[in-house]
């Protein structure tokens, strides 16, 4: 969204968590409202904006509850987002097709250690290379087409996911993250997939299991 106090964006948030031994995929749906609530000027003289995310049940009249506070830092070099205490370099300049940068250079190793990932791209996010795609092209999200948008492919890596059935003895993983921003609007779509499939130990009756998460954000409304 444009960075100005009082601006907001409302998203459909679909969150899927993959759990260990129950092999249960749990989908939770929310409305998420990102609201620009204040700003400050940091030591280098760049402006940082405080964005509060509110969540509401996806159905019925929205009842907003503050969930997290994030910070967007805008400079002449980049736009950084600190989300859940992780700082991402979301946009870099110049904004041209094929331009790449290390968007996770501030991210420590294994930031999602609670999941127990072992796939290298799920552990070492600093190895990701962000790439601009489809600069100034139309993009459709939430039933609306935006005339000028840009997609950032942050990572697209996989192991053994193209076979129709994962063999019990095979390790598999998926690491994918892309975001699309529309001109004068901001983030309109985010798709995040990080999971490992762990095969069962040999000569046991224990089943294999998937660990990780999938999150999509789709813009519904903004001011």
Please describe what each predicted stretch is:
Residues 1-223:
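Conserved functional acidic sites
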């Amino acid at each position: 969204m444009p960075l100005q106090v009082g601006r907001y964006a409302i998203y459909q948030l679909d969150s899927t968590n993959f759990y260990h031994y129950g092999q249960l995929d749990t989908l939770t749906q929310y409305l998420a409202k990102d609201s620009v609530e204040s700003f400050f000027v940091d030591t280098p003289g760049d402006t940082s904006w405080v964005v509060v995310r509110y969540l509401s049940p996806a159905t019925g009249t929205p009842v907003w509850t503050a969930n997290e506070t994030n910070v967007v830092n805008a400079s002449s070099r980049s736009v950084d987002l600190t989300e859940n205490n992780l700082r991402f370099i979301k946009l870099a300049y110049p904004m041209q097709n094929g331009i790449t940068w290390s968007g996770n250079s501030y991210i420590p190793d294994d930031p999602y250690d609670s999941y127990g990932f072992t796939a290298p791209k799920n552990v070492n996010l600093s190895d990701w290379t962000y790439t601009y795609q489809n600069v100034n092209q139309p993009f459709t999200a939430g039933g609306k087409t935006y005339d000028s948008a840009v997609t950032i492919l942050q990572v697209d890596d996989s192991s053994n996911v193209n076979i129709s059935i994962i063999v019990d003895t095979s390790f598999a993983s998926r690491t994918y993250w892309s975001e699309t921003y529309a001109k004068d609007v901001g983030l309109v779509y985010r798709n995040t997939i990080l999971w490992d499939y762990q095969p069962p130990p040999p000569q046991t009756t224990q089943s294999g299991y998937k660990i990780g998460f999938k999150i999509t954000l789709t813009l519904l409304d903004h001011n």
